[in-house]
Amino acid sequence: MELKKLDYDLTVCKVASIDDIDLKAGFFFTEKTDEEISLVCLTDDTPLHTTDRDDGWKGFRIQGILDFSLIGILSKLSNILAENEIGIFAVSTYNTDYILVKKENFHKAMDVLVTAGYTLV
């Protein structure tokens, strides 16, 4: 399975209002529930006003479009990283999944995943 290394720094944060998010930014994930509005974005695009903020994330994208009938893809990746004491923040889109790790664990995560048989592109 191919994983695409994302070559930018990411921030995970919470905002008080959806209006705080630049919807014209080139790359971001947002989730809104009855409890919070979360945002994952390029660190340089982080809104000025956040209620909580955690910088220093890097990521991988599972290449290709994942069919909803596929089982265990994210679980397998997260287990490999957990066995090597690397925490993750996972984000899913309609097509695929993204795995974020803290910047200080990024190179270790790449090495571990390649050793486990994944191809990084």
Question: PLM features: residue spans?
Answer:
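Regulatory modules associated with amino-acid/nitrogen control
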Residues: 1-82, 108-121
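A generic structural motif
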Residues: 36-41, 96-102
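A cross-kingdom feature marking solvent-exposed beta-strand/loop segments within repeated
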Residues: 84-99, 105
